[in-house]
Curated annotation (Swiss-Prot):
InterPro entries: A-D-PHexomutase_a/b/a-I, A-D-PHexomutase_a/b/a-I/II/III, A-D-PHexomutase_a/b/a-II, A-D-PHexomutase_a/b/a-III, A-D-PHexomutase_C, A-D-PHexomutase_C_sf, A-D-PHexomutase_CS, Alpha-D-phosphohexomutase_SF. Mg(2+) binds at residues 96, 233, 235, 237. Its EC number is 5.4.2.10. This is Probable phosphoglucosamine mutase. The lineage of its organism: Archaea, Methanobacteriati, Methanobacteriota, Thermococci, Thermococcales. GO terms for molecular function: magnesium ion binding; phosphoglucosamine mutase activity. The modification Phosphoserine is found at residue 96. The gene is glmM.
Amino acid sequence: MGKYFGTSGIREVVNEKLTPELALKVGLALGTYLGEGRVVVGIDTRTSSEMIKHALVSGLLATGIEVVDIGLAPTPLTGFAIKLYNADAGVTITASHNPPNYNGIKVWDRNGMAYTPDKESELERIIEEETFKRVSWMEIGEVIKADPKKEYIKNAVEQINLENSYTVVVDSGNGAGSIVSPYLQRELGNKVISLNSHPTGFFVRELEPNRKSLDMLSKVVREVGADVGIAHDGDADRIGVVDDQGNFVDYEVMLSLIAGYMIEKYGKGKVVTTVDAGFALDDYLKPRGGEVIRTKVGDVAVAYELSKHGGVFGGEPSGTWIIPQWNLTPDGIFAGALVVEMIDKLGPISELAKEVPRYVTLREKIPCPNELKQKVMRIIEKLALQNFEYKNLIDIDGIRIENEEWWILFRPSGTEPIMRITLEAHTKEKAEELMKKARGLVKEAIEKAKLS
């Protein structure tokens, strides 16, 4: 993790670490790195997004870059617009599922894939050295206003094949997805009921579309007898799903179902996921001809492996999915359309989910200062060896220890000052026993790091 960029671009508290001054420098650095060309810029609904956007755009213009300002736009729309307008890069001003006092800057390449750590490191070098390109008054870039929504919806509809119409409840979480996701479902011929569809930076619910935050969506799906509920985070790069019975579908289960459907739709092939994905995906895909490849957490790592191996699908157990036949940008909106297509072809999710093997997955977050994370991870590796009997240790992203019965992943967040523990076991009792032990281990490591 660099000085500014984490696992998902820059993501910090507004007017503390993420300031207009920093946004200006990022714009200058990106324009300097590109040398010339066109950059698409979109924002989410946060109160600070316009402020950050204008500062960043000023930096781009100062280097002679032409800016295509698409205004309020979910991340998937920015990724789509990069190709639509033949741009050299794109920028989304968003903090995704983080609290409203956060914002962020995420950069995309000309293929719609997030900038790799190497490219972000180059931007950081330019910022630190302040070796910014500055053009003369005659060469300053211009801003072009554009709206790619209709083209996005038109192209998405052409990719989805529905034989029937469905009742779909869409909870946009007051985020940028509210201007696209319900409209795409309607254009597909579905009856749409919208929740939290007014774009605002004062979010009604927690932005992460998980079981806890989607009580209202579950209730509405049950009350109206809907076929499915679709939910998004602030920039709609994620998807959460509620089945036809009004039950939230666990991320791991939904990941397995949609990956299996993509194999059925496009043929046998590789599925890319991250180190925090559990056993279910492997068990579900193996008899269907799917090969699972694991990589670092973050959509850029998934997208890179997809492009490298030619996979049919990539996804994280956080509801972040990449459909390479569509784009290398994580897209919760197009994912929602695919979910309905899966229902159309295979049947209700409540029935499909019964085929996915079930394990007990637990997750916890423990506060940890960013400056201590590296030291804490070194201590965790030593303590894990002393406290757990495991067969394999995987350290491509954090530390994952595992055997045939369970696995535990210790990983520092790349976007927040926390340590994450993710684990899976065959029984609830074993999972809780492992979490108690893992929690104590992380807290001990943090205390030791503070003293050393």
